[in-house]
From Swiss-Prot:
The keyword Iron does not apply. This is Rho GTPase-activating protein SYDE1. Expressed in trophoblast cells of placental villi. It comes from Homo sapiens (Human). Residues 398-604 form the Rho-GAP domain.
Length: 735
């Protein structure tokens, strides 16, 4: 950078010294100086002797001590003077000589403008090559440089103070040199010097983003001297301020357009500008706010904590969201609650995406927030995609009668329900948390596709699907996606009436009455619901293992088997919202299904075995018939010295009728010191000695007979009790 400046400086000094000589020489010779055609060995143009002497003058010591140059050096500042004198020697060696071989740069005048806006002359384009017919005083610029056209002789002679203007420019050289040294390496400056453009502004990479706007350029591309800097386009533009609130279109979702049927695919760019109208309560402190963005109920983006202002909160947040079948965009304003140490929603707004981007790709909206506030945002949809072509449903989402008609399964129950229920009852009744846990989503997607292809070919063996939760999840997904729920509106009303008429905790319903509740359903729905209720009743019977009581099963299957909204409810207050109605419906769903499961019989349990109670109850014995021999035997009570048997033994019952099957332990299970066999007494021996007749017959060899002589004490007490019972019947005995 310093070399061209030195060449320019000394060329101007040299031009001032050559001007009188050229005039005198021209008058003497009468013809202008001519220069021969340049040649590679001798690039310096030939001139007369007087001109050559003048050209070599500045390089000699005498020329350096000329009074004009001394005056010029005295006018410079000390730092500029030292810089000019220190760089003069290498400049003389490289630039001020008669010519540099191999470069093709002859010695001549070099014009250079360090400050472009101060030079009123526009830059001229560099000629492609040297022109042989040019004058000697004009000179040739170095290759790759873009000098301005030199001034004419008339302008040079008429200039009142060329030395003064040059000195002013030379004062700026140190600062310009320092700035250019910070721009980059020398190689970068060489590339800029070799650029074909003649504009110093593009060479110095100046930026116009910091300058004020100047007047427009003229037709010739020139600008006024004080028009400011130009820009090369690499510098960033000054960011524009936020748009005014009047440029945003007010937007509010009506109550009848909560669920649009269409969907949207693409990339959504959302820029938040601010929140307005959030007026805190009187005396409340500023709150920490944040904004949460949801797409179809799923949280997708969130801002950091923001300090809420009195009325308006300025935002500058941009989010890029991928949309897949998106319908609703919801913005929630969350406020920090120090009591529970968490954020709570204080306002929310909803945007219907398909209707917003209908016919346009960008919208600036002022979204109305509930209960108060406005959200200023710009929504831009890019890379919009068409809705993917969905295949016709074959199992999931197909009406139940149509699926049964296509598959023709046994029992009018779809194959997917039959196969899933069979596998669950075979290997899942004792699994803890059945129907509560969720299986792998990838495996469920694979099984779902298999059912869509061919339900009859699906095998749910334990080797292929060892996780029973995958099968339970597929069953619940199928029931959830039915167009019409299994428990329809008429059945729902019938069950509610039955619950009000016969509560299960007061009067247990009968089997016929519970099954009769399903008579209002069509055949296919009734068969399918009957199979499911039988299955759920069987699962609840194993609640000791799987912890799935009827109440837990009702919680899992209530929202699946019943519709989302059963009956129109009364209009509620605006503050309650749809959440309260959904909670009430969910509670009713659980109660209805719980009632059905409690009162539903389980036909797959084994039927009750024959009643075993008669074996334990005392039988009504027929009257005792005693076989009488020829000598008539008279039965009379025998006197006892002791008291009668205690009352506890009077109703001990007849143990002799129980038989061997009821007492498998044999005859000796009551053997012990108090139940030894009683032998005959002395009185009996005396009677035998006297010769009284002895009762003989079939009872003598029968060990089970009541008069067996091998009776124990307990049997004897039972026999006495029987005799006393028979005597109390007023039987006439012949004496």
């Amino acid at each position: 950078m310093a070399e061209p400046l030195l060449r320019k400086t000394f060329s101007r000094l040299r031009g001032r010294e050559k001007l009188p000589r050229k005039k005198s020489d021209a008058k003497e010779r009468g013809h202008p100086a001519q220069r021969p055609e340049p040649s590679p060995p001798e690039p310096e143009p030939q001139a007369p002797e007087g001109s050559q002497a003048g050209a070599e003058g500045p390089s000699s010591p005498e020329a350096s001590r000329s009074p004009a140059r001394g005056a010029y050096l005295q006018s410079l500042e000390p730092s500029s003077r030292r810089w000019v004198l220190g760089g003069a020697k290498p400049a003389e060696d490289t630039s001020l000589g008669p010519g540099v071989p191999g470069t093709g740069e002859p010695a001549g005048e070099i014009w250079y403008n360090p400050i472009p806006e101060e030079d009123p002359r526009p830059p001229a384009p560099e000629p492609p090559g040297p022109q042989p017919g040019s004058a000697e005083s004009e000179g040739l610029a170095p290759q790759g440089a873009a000098p301005a056209s030199p001034p004419t002789k008339a302008s040079r002679t008429k200039s009142p103070g060329p030395a003064r203007r040059l000195s002013i420019k030379m004062k700026k050289l140190p600062e310009l040199r320092r700035r250019l040294s910070l721009r980059g390496p020398r190689a970068g400056r060489e590339r800029e010097r070799a650029a074909p453009a003649g504009s110093v502004i593009s060479r110095y990479h100046l930026d116009s983003s910091v300058g004020g706007p100047g007047p427009a350029a003229g037709p010739g591309g020139t600008r006024s001297p004080r028009a400011g800097y130009l820009s090369d386009g690499d510098s960033p533009e000054r960011p524009a301020g936020p748009p005014s609130p009047t440029s945003f279109r007010p937007y509010e979702v009506g109550p009848a357009a909560r669920a649009p049927p269409a969907a949207l695919w693409g990339r959504l760019s959302l820029h938040l500008y601010g929140l307005g109208g959030l007026r805190p309560a009187p005396g409340a402190t500023p709150r920490d706010l944040c904004c949460l963005l949801q797409v179809d109920g799923e949280a997708r983006a969130r801002t950091g904590p923001l300090r809420g202002g009195p009325d308006f909160l300025r935002l500058d947040h941009t989010f890029h969201l991928e949309l897949e079948a998106a319908r609703l965009l919801r913005a929630l304003v969350l406020a920090w609650d120090p009591g529970v140490r968490r954020h709570r929603p204080c306002a929310q707004g909803t945007v219907l995406l398909p209707t917003v981007f209908r016919g346009c790709q960008a919208q600036q909206l002022a979204v109305r927030l509930e209960p108060q506030g406005l959200l200023y945002a710009k929504l831009t949809l890019s890379e919009q995609q068409e809705a993917p072509a969905t295949a016709e449903p074959r199992v999931f989402g197909l009406p139940l009668p149509l699926l049964v008609e296509r598959e023709r399964p046994p029992g009018q129950v779809p194959l997917i329900i039959q196969k899933c229920v069979g596998q669950i009852e075979r290997r899942g009744l004792r699994v803890v948390g059945l129907y509560r846990l969720c299986g792998s989503a990838a495996v469920k997607k694979e099984l779902r596709d298999a059912f869509e292809r061919d339900s009859a070919a699906v095998c749910l063996s334990e080797d292929l699907y060892p996780d029973i939760n995958v099968i339970t999840g597929i069953l619940k997904d199928y029931l959830r996606e039915l167009p019409t729920p299994l428990i329809t509106q008429p059945l729902y009303k019938v069950v509610l009436e039955a619950m009000a008429r016969d509560p299960p905790n007061r009067v247990p319903p009968t089997t016929e009455g519970t099954r009769g509740l399903l008579s209002c359903l069509p055949d296919v729905e009734r068969a399918t619901l009957t199979l499911l209720l039988d299955h759920l009743r069987l699962v609840s019977s194993f609640h000791a293992y799987n912890r799935m009581t009827p109440q837990n099963l009702a919680v899992c299957f209530g929202p699946v088997l019943l519709p989302a909204r059963q009956a129109p409810t009364r209009p509620r207050a605006r503050s309650s919202g749809p959440g309260l109605a959904s909670a009430v419906d969910f509670k009713h769903h659980i109660e209805v299904l719980h009632y059905l499961l409690q009162s539903w019989p389980d036909p797959r349990l084994p039927r009750q075995s024959p009643d075993v109670a008669p074996y334990l109850r005392p039988k009504r014995q027929p009257p005792l018939h005693l076989p009488l021999a020829d000598p008539e035997v008279v039965t009379r009570p025998r006197g006892r010295g002791g008291p009668e048997s205690p009352p506890s033994n009077r109703y001990a019952g007849d143990w002799s009728v129980c038989g061997r099957d009821f007492l498998p332990c044999g005859r000796d299970f009551l053997s012990g010191p108090d139940y030894d066999h009683v032998t005959g007494s002395d009185s009996e021996d005396e009677d035998e000695e006297v010769g009284e007749p002895r009762v003989t017959g079939d009872f003598e060899d029968d060990f089970d007979a009541p008069f067996n002589p091998h009776l124990n004490l307990k049997d004897f007490d039972a026999l006495i009790l029987d005799l006393e019972r028979e005597l109390s019947k007023q039987i006439n005995v012949c004496l």
